[in-house]
Amino acid sequence: MDACVSMSENYFDEALPRLLALLNDPDPTIYRTAVKGLGVFGHGVLFPLLDLYDKTDNGTVKACCIKAFVQVAVNFPDAVFPEQAIQALKLALDDINPVVSQSALMTLGYFSKQEHEKERVIPILIQVCNSTNIAHVQSAVMSLAEIDSTEVDQCFERMINHDSTDVLIKEILEASMSRRQSLFGN
């Protein structure tokens, strides 16, 4: 990681295009390392990542761009993401590639636990709870379970009391509500 920090501080303009290009590498070890490396570069990589995300049809590259957002957030926890990044994540939820959409959900879930991002992200995750995609609903519910919010309480109550809610989702909701009770005493 020291090498990435050194590159970000001394060779940003030279290293950034190379790291972005490595997201196209077929070797998972290479592109995963590039994702981690991009996270060390900070918020200066967000717009190039958004640009690459918009230009590529490669699902792995799209997912890597999204996962790099999390790495930036991990390394720079106090910085606020631009609205374009949040909107890209919201649009990625509808991507036909499940790796891309689940990566977006994972990233939104991570952001939902950050004090300065939760106001923008919680409503998106609540909206996902109304999806017909059970995997998405499950991910959203599990992310929301760890957030102390009356909006989440209301969402969970609506879902668990609604007749059309899938049985599996109701089980996840019950477990999530129990978790919320132990975390927040709600």
Curated annotation (Swiss-Prot):
InterPro entries: ARM-like (IPR011989), ARM-type_fold (IPR016024)
Keyword Phosphoprotein recorded: no
Keyword Cell inner membrane found: no
Keyword annotations from UniProtKB, A to Z: Antenna complex, Phycobilisome
Pfam family, one: HEAT_2
One Gene Ontology CC term in the entry: phycobilisome
Role summary: Involved in the biosynthesis of bilin.
Designated name of the protein: Bilin biosynthesis protein CpeZ
Organism classification: Bacteria, Bacillati, Cyanobacteriota, Cyanophyceae, Synechococcales
